[in-house]
């Protein structure tokens, strides 16, 4: 328990500041996206100030090994890095989805992120330590990169990895009525 905080659960007055919510933290340099934490608990100090117990998400470039080609632009890692943040400092809301949920979004906004890995910051370890790979390049899935399924083998490929382009694949699929 944080030494300055009494264990008096507070009322959670708004959607933006409730248990389980994530919010953009704009402390990193402006060139980097926000580094959102997830609220786990809100407590009231003896002074009446409210504090949030949060766990931080890490961007790939902050983790051991750095950003890889398969990490998407909006990818974050859950972590075991906990901290306390003043509730009054929270000024926004964002959503951190599991990868499958993110793939199902009809529209991805600036406040949508996704996660598929947990990162133990103190040890520099990831879970899971292996993920499925796709395409001739044998890379894990990156939702930012266009892929097409081969009807013959039902495998997924990046057009450029099989000597094609997104435009050529789109025109081919359009001519056969397979693309909206």
Residue ranges and their predicted role:
Residues 137-142, 153, 161, 176-179:
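Short Cys/His-rich metal-coordination motifs, predominantly Zn2+-binding knuckles/fingers
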Residues 21, 31-45, 52-55:
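Short beta-strand-centered aromatic/proline hotspots
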Residues 24-25:
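A generic structural signal for residues embedded in beta-strands
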Residues 167-180:
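A short beta-strand-loop micro-motif that forms or neighbors metal/cofactor-
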Residues 150-170:
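Cys/His-coordinated zinc-finger cores
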Residues 36, 51, 131-134, 147, ...:
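Residues immediately within or flanking Cys/His clusters that coordinate Zn2+
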Residues 1-17, 48-140, 180:
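Epigenetic mark-reader domains in eukaryotic nuclear proteins
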Residues 17, 28-32, 151-152, 158:
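Helix-boundary capping/turn motifs
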């Amino acid at each position: 328990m944080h030494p300055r905080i009494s264990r008096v659960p507070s009322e959670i007055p708004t959607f933006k500041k409730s248990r389980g919510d994530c919010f953009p933290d704009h402390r990193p340099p402006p060139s980097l996206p926000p580094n959102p934490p997830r609220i786990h608990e809100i407590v009231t100090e003896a002074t009446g100030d409210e504090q949030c117990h949060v766990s931080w998400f890490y961007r790939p470039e902050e983790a051991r090994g750095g950003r890889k080609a398969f990490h998407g632009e909006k990818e974050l890692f859950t972590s075991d890095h906990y901290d306390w943040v003043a509730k009054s400092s929270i000024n926004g809301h964002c959503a951190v989805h599991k990868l499958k949920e993110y793939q199902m979004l009809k529209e991805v906004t600036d406040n949508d992120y996704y996660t598929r890995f947990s990162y133990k910051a103190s040890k520099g370890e990831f879970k899971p330590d292996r993920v499925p790979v796709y395409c001739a390049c044998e890379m894990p899935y990156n939702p930012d990169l266009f892929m097409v399924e081969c009807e013959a083998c039902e495998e997924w490929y990046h057009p450029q990895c099989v000597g094609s382009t997104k435009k050529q694949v789109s025109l081919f699929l359009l001519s056969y009525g397979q693309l909206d």
